[in-house]
Amino acid sequence: MNKILTFLSVLLMVFSSQAQVKGDQKKVVEVSSLTEFRTYLNQDNVHVKLKAGNYQVDDAKKIRFFEITGNNSYFDLKGARFMVDSKLFSRPDLIKSTDGNSMYCAIEISGNHVMLEGLYIETYGDTPGLQSKNKIFNIVGEHVTLKDVELRTAGSSPWGYGYLYGLGGGDVRKMNGIRVGYPAKNVKLLGCKVHMRAMGHAIFLQGSENTLIEGCEVDGLLRTTDAMLKETSGYGFDKNFYAAKGNYIEGTNVAEDGKILPGEIISLSEDGIRMYPDYNGHPTTNTTVKNCTVTQMRRGICTGLSTSGDKVIDCVVRDCVATGYNVGNADTLINCSADAKYGEAFCIAYTDAKNAKVEMNILDSRNGIANNLLAKINGTGHHVVIKTEAPEFIPEAMAIKLSVWEGYGNFDENAKMHATDITLNNQTNTEVITFNGTENVDIKSKGKVRKATDSENEVNDSNRTKR
């Protein structure tokens, strides 16, 4: 009898749990138009499947063209393609937001526990926005996941000159990819692709917490200044090929008076994956970037501006102009790779950065232009390992330099340049040069290690004011 009662109790529990699972499952709502799709964006607990196909986005009511404000929802957009007319970003009649941020974007997700999967979205046209803060995605909710989303940006101005005419304001109108910003927490970007065909960042964070960026790919375009100087019309031609400022501009050298020089190279976009320090006083913290690739951007992966200590794991950066990895305070790079064709493979640029850990594999850096700096190390207490699979990948003219103004970073000309308490294991044949301000370093190197000459130190110090 007891066995029968036990069996019946177990059977009842099984049926109850199955009923509970069925009750928790959301009914899939299938829609086939953007009008229908919009009706579910402010609803909670929905599972929406948009029919595969091409969708034209050429009208909107607000500066956030699609606003996903509902919670606990899943949007299945696999096979759907949104073609967004860049003219929408210049519409002054669209309703402004109430969050104090005037930026235009195609899709904003402010709801919590939302997943959006599978969308291809592209901006097209050459109409620049009203302001420089345009972007495709703006994520400000908690526990939001973008999965297998693909973006292609267009519609920035002036196009074809990268950062030579400024980073925002003035004539510059950007079209960024994905922003994750305060009050976003626990956001995941999984398997996303961003094709940058506009000035702007591909993926960037401002005041977010606990962000995971995994399996994502970013690519941009490069252009030589030689090609630019051959123009017979256009924005640069009208400016007589003078940039917005002189000397060093984000990885590209111009003349002291701003004249664009031959033999240089620029990225037509900005950074691949970038952390800003904060958003309105809310710090960007605890970011992990894993198994990502960045190609042909200004900086590849830029954690250096966030001081909380971020993790970059198993990432690959190729053909970036300012630096492959911008490393900062307490950052950890594990099994990462980069080349130094057009800019240093990585830099720990800031004098106030402490205790970074870097494992860097140098990729084929031959056949580049305008760069002989393999890596630069400033700051205090870093542990760095540099290696390569083939010695011939690194040209003999390249060097690893400590305590230098050269290359990206060091914008405070009053800073005391130094590299202190550094542990460097250089497993390449590349020469290591220590400049004035290098103290208490532990260097193991296959390549020659030497102190900079007096003339080299003079040149280094002269770069202090050429940022």
Language-model features and meaning:
Residues 21-49:
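Acidic Gly/Asp/Thr-rich repetitive segments characteristic of extracellular carbohydrate-active
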Residues 59-64, 84-90, 125-134, 155-163, ...:
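Short glycine/acidic-rich loop motifs that flank beta-strands on beta-rich extracellular proteins
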Residues 10-18:
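Hydrophobic h-region of N-terminal signal peptides that target proteins for export
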Residues 48-50, 75-77, 111-118, 141-148, ...:
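All-beta strand scaffolds that present successive hydrophobic residues in beta-strands
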Residues 26, 45, 52, 63, ...:
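Surface-exposed or flexible loop/turn and strand-edge residues in extracellular/cell-surface modules
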Residues 103-108, 126, 134-138, 169-184, ...:
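Right-handed parallel beta-helix
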Residues 2-10:
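Sec-dependent signal peptide recognition
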Residues 38-43, 56-74, 83-117, 123-145, ...:
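Extracellular beta-strand-rich solenoid/capping regions of secreted or surface-exposed proteins
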